[in-house]
Amino acid sequence: MPIIRRTSRATASSSKSATSSILRQAILVFTGFLLGALFMVFVPSLYNAAEPSSLHRLMNPIRRNTLSARASSDILKLGNPGPVSDLLERSGYILSYNRRDRLAHWVGEHLTSASLQAGQGVDRDKSNFQEDTDIPEMFRAHLKDYVSSGYDRGHQAPAADDLSSQEAMDETFLLSNMAPQVGVGFNRHYWAYLEGFMRDLTQNFTDVYVYTGPLFLPSAASTGRKNPAYSIEYPFLGATTPNVPVPTHFFKIALTTTASSEYALGAFVLPNQAIDSSTPLTNFKVELEAIEKAAGLVFFDKLDRSKFADLCSKTTCQVR
């Protein structure tokens, strides 16, 4: 399958072969601990989650969606090329769709003990993977993209989260809710355990808001100079042409509430690779700002995040 390589160099480049060799080694030894350290490189010191006003400015820049008469009547009079972010509402989740990558930017869910109750006759075996016809065909992920690719069609909003009706279950099998994931050791194991952990949170918390999405993260490679080079490499799926990129990582964020409106936050980033089931979930715990910086998103901007407790101080963060 096609491979995409993207490199951003802070200094003069080293040889391509050396960089590729180092990159492959880095990917093999990449762990949650190193991931957290890498993320901190991308979090600017001026970004302070304790200042809601700064978050408001990030989410609502001064000129956002504001066009002058000249722009509308002159430069864009023949049309606005985009980008377009399709916001799709389903029975059990909402997603923002990335037309370039044929993946979701994010998928959002609101889990409660009541929402996880199974409706009569709901059966996963009745559901089938489907292309999402709400997405224009040229920007759509196709069933044939995944055939013999070596990757699973990994749910972002899990099927087990949407048991209220067969329709809700079926909607989780739309390809807009999928991303290429390593099967054995990840999608079928550790990632599934993480999904179960999110559902289990409803036993101790009134509401659980979950956001999930893909990430494409670079690795640092030594150049022998003061500043490193950052490189990224990932394959594309596609029956005839490259169509769906394979994320290097995935994030999952949980914001829980109690009856007294106390918030607790947990943010995790996992590499898209087999993970030993004994690996502590806390190895993949990161600061929320790290995900925001990497994904270009801002979460929970209507809340004072300085009041969020650490989820792992309120419950045991572990998968099983």
UniProtKB/Swiss-Prot annotation:
One of its GO terms (cellular component) is mitochondrial inner membrane. Keywords: Disulfide bond, Endonuclease, Glycoprotein, Hydrolase, Magnesium, Manganese, Metal-binding, Nuclease, Secreted, Signal. Its EC number is 3.1.30.-. Its cofactor is Mg(2+); Mn(2+). Glycans are attached at residue 204. It comes from the Eukaryota. Its main location: secreted. Mg(2+) binds at residue 187. InterPro entries: DNA/RNA_endonuclease_AS (IPR018524), DNA/RNA_non-sp_Endonuclease_sf (IPR044929), Endo_G_ENPP1-like_dom (IPR001604), ENPP1-3/EXOG-like_nuc-like (IPR020821), His-Me_finger_sf (IPR044925), Non-specific_endonuclease (IPR040255). GO terms for biological process: apoptotic DNA fragmentation. The active site is at residue 155. It is found in: Secreted. One of its GO terms (molecular function) is single-stranded DNA endodeoxyribonuclease activity. Disulfide bonds join 312-317. Glycosylated. Homodimer; as a result of non-covalent interactions and not through the disulfide linkages between the two monomers. Belongs to the DNA/RNA non-specific endonuclease family. This is Nuclease.
